[in-house]
Each structure stands twice: as C-alpha cells, then as structure tokens.
Amino acid sequence: MTTASPQDIAARLGSGLLSFPVTHLRADGSFDEAAYREHIAWLGGHDAAGLFAAGGTGEFFSLTPAEVEQVVTAAVREAPEGLPVIAPAGYGTATAIEMARAAERAGAHGILLLPPYLTEAGQRGLVEHVRQVCAATDLGVIVYSRANAAYSAPAVAELADRCPNLIGFKDGIGNIEQMTRIYAEVGDRLFYVGGLPTAEMFALPYLALGVTTYSSAIFNFVPQFALDFYRAVRRNDAPFVLNALAEFVIPYCELRNREPGYAVSIIKAGMTVIGRPAGPVRSPLTDLDDAELAELADLVKKVS
C-alpha cells in the first residue's frame, strides 16, 4: 500500500469491519507461513477495513517477538494493496518499543499497543508507557484498554494531546459510563474500536457511543455473515442484529464460555469446520473436543 499518514490509516480503519486473523501453526507448534499467507489472501477477498496480524486472536501471547515480526511480515506481503496491516506491541515499555520498531521493519501501517504484561500501574505510569511507545515510532498507535491497563478519560485526553500519532482507542472492558466519559473528553480526535471478546455482542449499543468499528474474530471463518452483521449495525437495523445474535452469536458465545481461553480456540475450530484448518492452539490453550466441534459445525451451517 502506498505511504499513508496515521490520520489516513485511522480514517480507513474506522470506516469498516476489522479482521483479526488466527496464526496458522503446524502440528509441532511452529508457524506455518504458507498456510497463513493463503488465509490472508482469502480474507483479503472480503471487504475488511484493516487486518490486525498476530493480535489476541492470533495468539500474540504465545508468540516470541521474532515470530511476531515473521507473522506481521507475512501479512504485509500477502495483504491486498490498500488494506492496512496493524502489528501488535506489548509487554513492558522497552519490549513494546522494540516490537514497534520491528513493525516498522516489517512494513506495517500501524500498531496495536496491548496491555503491559503481569503488572499493575496507575494512570501516570500507563500514560508514560504509551507516550514512550508513541515517541519511538512514526506509525499510528491504537491503545488497547483492557484488564490491568484500564485508561481513564483524563489519561486518554492527555495522551491525545501529547501524542500526535495516537490514532485510536480500543475498549476491552465494557464500562459504558467510562466510554461515554472518554468520548466526551476526546471526541473525534481518535477513532474507537470495540474490543470485547466476540465484539458483535456489544456492537449495536457501542455504536451510539461513537464506536464505529470492532474486532471481528468470527470473520476468520464466517466472513460474509460477519460483514452482513456489521453493515446491519452501521445502519442501525436492530431487527436484523437481534435475530443474528439469537441465531448464531449468543449460542456461539455459550460454547466459547465453556473453557477459559476458548475465545481463541473456537476460532481455530471454526476454521476446521469450514475446511480451512489453521492447526492447533499453543499451550496453555486447549482445542475444542469433538463434541464441541460438532456443535460449532451445526451453528455455522445456520449462517453459511
């Protein structure tokens, strides 16, 4: 894709559905680049606004920094012209900066900054963490508010003032009051991403808060359904959305909730169901069993 400013990338990402591809692994757990690139090409035939390589759905937490760079590089090389590829950065500040620089080497068009690893920090510490990462790269940065990195409205406003390349805020907490406060303070200076697990569950009410897009993991294996659902959300078609929730999304979430970590495992199971297997999940995650796989297959038939 031709060189685009962080603001151009933000406008593109905020205008459509966001794809979070799985990372393909062989039986021995190694990265299967050929299969991954084929999947990226297949997803590129559908109308996503951006592709987030090696994110949470892509098992970022189980990949080494070198593997993350390899996955991002493969995504950049295979993604169709004009589709932004966003790379992850995370862990402590120093490691996140290294990963941001690796994203630049790989040719990524932006960065999703995941929460720091295994530590608690106050708002001053979180602001400084984001500020340092933003200062270390020319790429646009999207900050992910989740778990141990829950950003307050004043913190987000300060970051928007201090970091010209902070372009987006992804919410993985689901606090409606907090999102309302953030949008009231920051407004359209950032674009907003719904980032709760199976974000389709929250997409319609979040639209009213200025959240115009969300991370779709199910796009991996039911891309047309995911796009139809997103378009219904954007046109405020509540009857369509509610019917789709009842028919597929809610029972899918019930299956997802049976085991911790199934939010990722069930996506790879969906890939198996449609005949495009992506390999196993890495430990400590576990794959769905045969009975659960059959349940998922029945659900997929309803929307395929």
Swiss-Prot record:
Protein name per its UniProtKB record: Probable 5-dehydro-4-deoxyglucarate dehydratase
Family per similarity comment: Belongs to the DapA family.
SMART domains linked: DHDPS
GO biological process: D-glucarate catabolic process
Domain of life (superkingdom): Bacteria
Any coiled-coil regions, as ranges: none
InterPro entries according to UniProt: Aldolase_TIM, DapA-like, Dehydro-deoxyglucarate_dehyd
EC number: 4.2.1.41
UniProt GO molecular function: 4-hydroxy-tetrahydrodipicolinate synthase activity; 5-dehydro-4-deoxyglucarate dehydratase activity
Organism: Nocardia farcinica (strain IFM 10152)
Entry keyword annotation includes Lyase: yes
Known catalytic reactions: 5-dehydro-4-deoxy-D-glucarate + H(+) = 2,5-dioxopentanoate + CO2 + H2O
Major enzyme class: lyase
Keywords: Lyase
Known pathway: Carbohydrate acid metabolism; D-glucarate degradation; 2,5-dioxopentanoate from D-glucarate: step 2/2
Disulfide bonds: none
